[in-house]
Amino acid sequence: MFNQKIVDQAPRKLTSRLTNSSSLISIEKERDACGVGFIADVNNVANHKIVVQALEALTCMEHRGACSADRDSGDGAGITTAIPWNLFQKSLQNQNIKFEQNDSVGVGMLFLPAHKLKESKLIIETVLKEENLEIIGWRLVPTVQEVLGKQAYLNKPHVEQVFCKSSNLSKDRLEQQLFLVRKKIEKYIGINGKDWAHEFYICSLSCYTIVYKGMMRSAVLGQFYQDLYHSEYTSSFAIYHRRFSTNTMPKWPLAQPMRFVSHNGEINTLLGNLNWMQSREPLLQSKVWKDRIHELKPITNKDNSDSANLDAAVELLIASGRSPEEALMILVPEAFQNQPDFANNTEISDFYEYYSGLQEPWDGPALVVFTNGKVIGATLDRNGLRPARYVITKDNLVIVSSESGVVQVEPGNVKSKGRLGPGQMISVDIFSHKILNNKEIKTSVTTKIPYGELLTDARQILEHKPFLSDQQVDIKKLMQLQTAFGYTNEDVELVIEHMASQAKEPTFCMGDDIPLSILSEKSHILYDYFKQRFAQVTNPAIDPLRESLVMSLAIQIGHKSNLLDDQPTLAKHIKLESPVINEGELNAIFESKLSCIRINTLFQLEDGPKNFKQQIQQLCENASQAILDGNNILVLSDKNNSLDSEKVSIPPLLAVGAVHHHLINKGLRQEASILVETAQCWSTHHFACLIGYGASAICPYLAFETARHWWSNPKTKMLMSKGRLPACNIQEAQANYKKAVEAGLLKILSKMGISLLSSYHGAQIFEILGLGSEVVNLAFKGTTSQIGGLSMIELGRETVNIHSKAFSEVKTKKLANYGFVQYRPGGEYHINNPEMSKALHQAVRGYNPEYYNNYQSLLQNRPPTALRDLLKLQSNRAPISIDEVESIEDILQKFCTGGMSLGALSRETHETLAIAMNRIGGKSNSGEGGEDPVRFKILNDVNSSGTSPLLPHLKGLKNGDTASSAIKQIASGRFGVTPEYLMNAKQLEIKIAQGAKPGEGGQLPGKKISPYIATLRKCKPGVPLISPPPHHDIYSIEDLSQLIFDLHQINPKAKISVKLVSEIGIGTIAAGVAKGNADIIQISGHDGGTGASPLSSIKHAGSPWELGLSEVHQLLAENQLRDRVTLRVDGGLRTGSDIVLAAIMGAEEFGFGTVAMIATGCIMARICHTNKCPVGVATQREELRARFSGVPEALVNFFLFIGNEVREILASLGYKSLDDITGQNHLLIKNTDINLTKTNGIQLDTLININNNTWTKFNSVHTNGPVMDDDILAIPEVSNAIKLETEITKHFKIANTNRTVGTRLSGIIAKNYGNTGFKGLIKLNFYGSAGQSFGAFLASGINLKLMGEANDYVGKGMNGGSIVIVPPAGTIYEDNNQVIIGNTCLYGATGGYLFAQGQAGERFAVRNSLAESVVEGVGDHACEYMTGGVIVVLGKAGRNVGAGMTGGLAYFLDEDENFIDRVNSEIVKIQRVITKAGEEQLKNLIENHAAKTGSLKAHTILEKWNSYLPQFWQVVPPSEANIDETNPTYSSNTIAAC
């Protein structure tokens, strides 16, 4: 039936049509998260109860999933079990089919196209017969279709099972054969282009396991598949999975489990993993597959989800002979480099080192549950970013789950409780009846082969070579080289020289306000067309400074070995600790045992840019030939002894990308590494681009030469001698530059949530703005370029233009300064130019329409700067009278200001903005940092001069004004987030990212932390405050859903908004946010302002809001989610025209940041980050704040102008309101009057050729539905106790489905009494397993006690009261190391007490401000970013204690004498308890802990106090170094014995 040759040679683009995901959308537009777990009987006793327990566990994690637009079709639920042979035998009796359980029988679980059953089954049967497998029969799976949601029902496949048998193969060999069968079936369907391919999917084909899954809610799975509740359906294990997808169209194959794994999380490095897997395929050889290995290819598929591709990689390794544990260790390795637990197990480190040269990690937050039917296990990602709790029972069950309490276990039956830490694994071998912990698994796997010896034989570690100590060219030649390669004066002075001096990237402010590179009239180097992507919502960014233990820039170069080799041999290779190498190190690589060749990237200008493409293709041929000649290091070099006007360098990024993809296509990519020796690489963004498109290392020889010249400059030496620059020698200057680049690279990796350079390498995690398909397909295939742009000839022309400037007849003594960063007359156009600012100030200071018209004209007649400048309005309606248009009051209600924090801004500015917005009925945004409760009051004491005793520092006030920000922001630092703050908001904004620095945190310098700011932020004056890059309670989409739930819980009247930054794929993220119950989604553009950000982030991260807004609006509309949310946009909005254009693209509300500040008095000095703002807008210095002249009326006037302009445009279009034009894309057309300098290839289809969907406008606030707090509040005694401030005690049972308990009570108390005014006492006792966020935002006067256990986020944001958690009565553990609460507890707490008789998970007390707590063990990153409070840990601690901790104290009991190695000593120091005050503080907390929990550990310590006290360490940040508790000098008593 098959032409085997054709099948074997099936092109990848055809085989990608296979259903294994033919129905799946692009990997860039698919995200998911989930709840996952397994139950396994260690003794391999099969029973129906395990299946039922798995189904019940699924139901208990329903809140971790989501539903489609019909609110009934689940995103996916499923289970994997052993094959229920008894059920199948009885079911097939009527077909006279018999087989024994131990026979070599395989079962396939199939989704088939209902209208092509015969054809699809014939293909399956034909392949089985070709592989000499006997077809026993078919079984129609009994289902109940009526229980499905509408969308799931309409897309439901035909579900049937096939049974096959081998007469001569063992079960293990048959399992491998079935893998081959499935790949052949999929390949055949793909190559023949079956139009039903998207309806065909093989859930499982195995003789050990079977998968039941579909697009349904948890509770529906067992109702739909009748088998699952059949008493004969027995299994000794079950894996279960509930999916939360950002994409909402039902896709049955996307439900999990996959065939081997169930995955909760996201693989950030997917595109790179897929590229490298494709490049690895030619090397794959295996004794298992022999000459049939080609039939398994392609291994992965770019059209599949990350989970499906990870499953495919795992499946390959397992089917080729690896154990499941080893397969996951290879693909998802632990962060072994800084693991003290491996200090005495070098074989484990050797294993990971060995495979780091063969397989780049699949990196990202992930809990991966896996099975091959014999071993069931789970592993966690290297950062521990997903929860994983386990229970081992006395009757030999092992239960692992995303949450504790999903499977009911009697307390007396619990043997132990624990959690998986970062990179850890647990497995159950049901055939040998063993439970293996992390160390046992990894020791077993790694001791089989002497990996250390293999490394010693094959690996060379590149030693550091000294930097050059002399200049290599004179200043004239240097300037000519710099000019030829595109350097400007700003690149040298602001970037390279700053990095050489300070060893860090330059910081800038106020955002990017110049034209996009493709719109600019000035030439740009190729890197400027690339925008870095970043993590938001579906996975977290990482802090590369505070969590450096999981980060690495190491990379290995040379020929790669065969990943499937069962007797590993390692090719010769070199390990680089950094991809940034100097000239000496490059020479050392040439002198190594590897075969290296330098390939010149210069081309002759014979035909001008016309031969540009041919020259690049020739370069690619040269590269492949070099490999065929035996070279395994290719150095692409633009270095030339003499600069020649007729020899132009191919841009190194273009050269690298083209060669990289050419070698992949030729099957040669694994044979060699690409290095780059280039002059055109100096900023961190340049390095990131080169590495992202395949370069393993870069020698930036001209950047180093520039640093040498800077150091040699007499001016530099003079500044050093006067102490105005740090002193260094010429080699240190180059080392500083390299250090700055490396730090910047780590930040770029980490903003995407990637830890390892080897995972970023070749991952192409960029978005292109301004390159056409010809360029992209040649060198950057797989990268999105939404708007098209330069052709090869046009790119060649720009390259030549840059080069030719070096040979201009005009001679200058300085490099050209085009003003790309700082405004300069005659330079690049800046929207925020002095002329514009002056016109705006004149207009708003007195409401002067003439000046506003001038302002408006300046912006309307500007050069094309943003994408919207290429559009114009059209309407088929006749103009109407402006009197028919909605009132200006209605329009003003749609306006907001951006989230600018009090701390970054002065108090005067912040309050003036809020008052102005409240006057017009708009909304100001508090930003991060809290708000003074005095601002919640309405002013009624304003005198005739416009001042008020309540706010005496403000001018221009009126009675009735209020300075309260309507929008209160919740950012990653949680500074000032208290119950009272949250209750005084009309909206609560979760800031996921910021336009000017997406994927990054922030730091408010100590000089901006005045006593007033410190009071609001619950910290100490003068101490720097760090906002983490991620929210530590948002590592996935279901985590965001939980925070939205928390905020709806405390303030059910406030709308919840989620702020995202525009990037490719934002539409699917927004879909997840909408399904997570958000009320508002805000899309910020890349050009938003900021108080401080790395310059490379301002310039090279994020994309225009026009693209993001259009994508979000379209996708939500297409998936019937548009009516669930309001869309808001911000980023560079300045005129009424901007508002109308944004509305047409889908926006309903509009945010103003920079321009609002200008209207209020900002003069764009662009020194916000220095605390030296000359007009008092962005400073905390009192003498500068006194200069602030702004009044609310100025901003009111600005918005009146904007509102009137909107009304005029609406009238001219013939529309009566903004609502009437929202999403009406037909009103936009391309402005053909604009001719761009560089290209006519811009494509605006994503903005103008869109279906005009209709939807019901969303106005209400989403609710959480029935919650436990409402039941508690419904009890009269409770409501009376709140009203009368009396004391009451109540008792309740609790389950993991009861989330955020105690929070709504706290909101009511805070609303009525503030944070501290309640005098009553409400005691609530709970029994069972509490859901997430137990006691979140707890208010003073509420004491919660839990007899049981709790999940993540206990005490998050608590402000008062107490939380006590103890094991349930009757619990007897075999050891004292029991986990009782989850991850990220006490996050952002501003007060209160927490006592937990057991261990906590990762990131305990992260960003704690004032809470005090005692626990009996913690995971990694305890006390991270802590600014106050006291923490006591009476047990083991994980790694990285005290990272970023700037305040508060912590005490750790160190019985194992290993605590010192677990502390991050960058900021804190540790010491013994050396003062009486410190001893009393510690002892008092332990006494409280003993009294409240009955802790045996606490009682033992107190009884033997004198012997235990010397075993405690005190963790002390600098701000606490001179207080009674830490310093004998300040304490009346010291402890002599210590």
From Swiss-Prot:
SUPFAM superfamilies: Alpha subunit of glutamate synthase, C-terminal domain (SSF69336), FMN-linked oxidoreductases (SSF51395), N-terminal nucleophile aminohydrolases (Ntn hydrolases) (SSF56235). It is found in: Plastid, Chloroplast stroma. Residues 34-431 form the Glutamine amidotransferase type-2 domain. GO terms for molecular function: 3 iron, 4 sulfur cluster binding; glutamate synthase (ferredoxin) activity; metal ion binding. GO terms for biological process: ammonia assimilation cycle; L-glutamate biosynthetic process. FMN binds at residues 1109-1166. Its cofactor is [3Fe-4S] cluster; FAD; FMN. The active site is at C34 (for gatase activity). Its main location: plastid. Gene3D superfamilies: Aldolase class I (3.20.20.70), Glutamate synthase, alpha subunit, C-terminal domain (2.160.20.60), Glutamine Phosphoribosylpyrophosphate, subunit 1, domain 1 (3.60.20.10). Pathway: Amino-acid biosynthesis; L-glutamate biosynthesis via GLT pathway; L-glutamate from 2-oxoglutarate and L-glutamine (ferredoxin route): step 1/1; Energy metabolism; nitrogen metabolism. PROSITE patterns: GATASE_TYPE_2. This is Ferredoxin-dependent glutamate synthase.
